[in-house]
Amino acid sequence: MAEVGGVFASLDWDLHGFSSSLGNVPLADSPGFLNERLGQIEGKLQRGSPTDFAHLKGILRRRQLYCRTGFHLEIFPNGTVHGTRHDHSRFGILEFISLAVGLISIRGVDSGLYLGMNERGELYGSKKLTRECVFREQFEENWYNTYASTLYKHSDSERQYYVALNKDGSPREGYRTKRHQKFTHFLPRPVDPSKLPSMSRDLFRYR
């Protein structure tokens, strides 16, 4: 995992000074090279067993993602992304994977799918860890976080595409979002294993 910082620094050219802090670690901006590296990371995660996760300590965080609109984000096995008001829902337990400074991917523990955003700003669950599944995690002044696509933004401005949930829990398209809207504000909430559905406890412990 030592080369991850160098690889993902090239995903976001706005991380001023980040590459210099990496010393002589080679940076690559070829989409093919990046996708290959993402595949390698995905493979390590999929092959992981309970004893294999020691090297990922501090890199993996299991959380619920609560939106200011009152919903927890869920990733379903069919690739659908939606919000629920149910605390500790089966598909609302998420794995936050730190890739580099401020860059993360989010995976559903039960569904095994990664949160992705396509060029239209639509959220979906991806079987593969691709560049569409990499987000910039930003801590805002109101103690909430925002999650912006590192791949897509408005072509006529610097405005980012953000992960967002509407007031009815449906996903809001990234092109319709702004950083200071409540739709885009999230709190990563701790997971209490005792509150998980019984069918999900083993997944939470071992996946």
UniProtKB/Swiss-Prot annotation:
<dbReference type="InterPro" id="IPR008996">
    <property type="entry name" value="IL1/FGF"/>
</dbReference>
<dbReference type="GO" id="GO:0005104">
    <property type="term" value="F:fibroblast growth factor receptor binding"/>
</dbReference>
<comment type="similarity">
    <text>Belongs to the heparin-binding growth factors family.</text>
</comment>
<dbReference type="GO" id="GO:0008543">
    <property type="term" value="P:fibroblast growth factor receptor signaling pathway"/>
</dbReference>
<keyword id="KW-0325">Glycoprotein</keyword>
<dbReference type="GO" id="GO:2000546">
    <property type="term" value="P:positive regulation of endothelial cell chemotaxis to fibroblast growth factor"/>
</dbReference>
<feature type="modified residue" description="Phosphoserine">
    <location>
        <position position="111"/>
    </location>
</feature>
<dbReference type="GO" id="GO:0070349">
    <property type="term" value="P:positive regulation of brown fat cell proliferation"/>
</dbReference>
<dbReference type="GO" id="GO:0008083">
    <property type="term" value="F:growth factor activity"/>
</dbReference>
<comment type="subunit">
    <text>Interacts with FGFR1 and FGFR2.</text>
</comment>
<dbReference type="Pfam" id="PF00167">
    <property type="entry name" value="FGF"/>
</dbReference>
<dbReference type="GO" id="GO:0005576">
    <property type="term" value="C:extracellular region"/>
</dbReference>
<comment type="function">
    <text>Plays an important role in the regulation of embryonic development, cell proliferation and cell differentiation, and is required for normal cardiomyocyte proliferation and heart development.</text>
</comment>
<keyword id="KW-0339">Growth factor</keyword>
<keyword id="KW-0964">Secreted</keyword>
<feature type="glycosylation site" description="N-linked (GlcNAc...) asparagine">
    <location>
        <position position="78"/>
    </location>
</feature>
<dbReference type="InterPro" id="IPR002209">
    <property type="entry name" value="Fibroblast_GF_fam"/>
</dbReference>
<keyword id="KW-0597">Phosphoprotein</keyword>
<protein>
    <recommendedName>
        <fullName>Fibroblast growth factor 16</fullName>
    </recommendedName>
</protein>
